[in-house]
């Protein structure tokens, strides 16, 4: 490990204090660092003039790892680019729950372990998400957490038909559906009543959101399944697809959303060696205090 990209969420890391502290620790340990913004900021946002921001797309060509500073959303945003470049990522939580993050902002000294090789890598399953309209692929993305198909802002329910390997698994009316990875089981899926699943297992979770059918429950499918979702014939309105909380994509009647296990896997850097159950217990206890 020689070259590290630091990607702070400028709306979370006030004054960039956390990323600058981390940069000093890493440089003192002999590592080369670059600070890059993970996304474009608002035009009215004042970036400090004394920090030199490098271009993320260029730095990804040469980096050995990416450290994300923010909440899980920041990590999810960076996971796609890092994974496509086969670069592992490490999360430093400056958010609320932060299930994916390895460190809290008070644990920055542990970053020195990157220089000495005292870390391990976790492989996390990702989802491949496509939408076909007639014969054309009109949308494609990858997800570390989930793909959510929802009714949007309208008050009426959305009617969905869900199949696994071409066989109908459920048809229901409700607020929508979440197809998630085990990593995503502690995110939106959990809020919709889905189970907590160990993140290193290989499953696909199918979780209805506020289903009006009492028999529509979360399904834990094999990672070998292909899940297809369409608006049911009884549907009156469009639906919207969002991957890892990203920008919503409109689904029309006849569109087919397909979700399956991706060939790509996100590599998460582990420094602490903590049990997943310790993480779950600590996060929920901290959030409820």
Language-model-detected regions and their locations in the chain:
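ATP/NTP phosphate-donor binding region
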Residues: 1-65, 106-122, 131-141
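Short glycine-rich anion-binding loops that position phosphate/pyrophosphate groups of nucleotides
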Residues: 11, 72-74, 97, 183-185
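Short glycine/serine/threonine-rich phosphate/pyrophosphate-binding segments
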Residues: 15-16, 73-78, 186-191
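Short, acidic/small-residue loops that bind anionic groups at enzyme active sites
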Residues: 85-103
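Catalytic core of DAGKc-family lipid kinases
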Residues: 97-175
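ATP/nucleoside-binding phosphotransfer catalytic cores, i.e., glycine-rich phosphate-binding loops
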Residues: 149, 165-168, 217-289
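Gly/Ser/Thr-rich active-site loops/lids in small-molecule metabolic enzymes
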Residues: 170-215
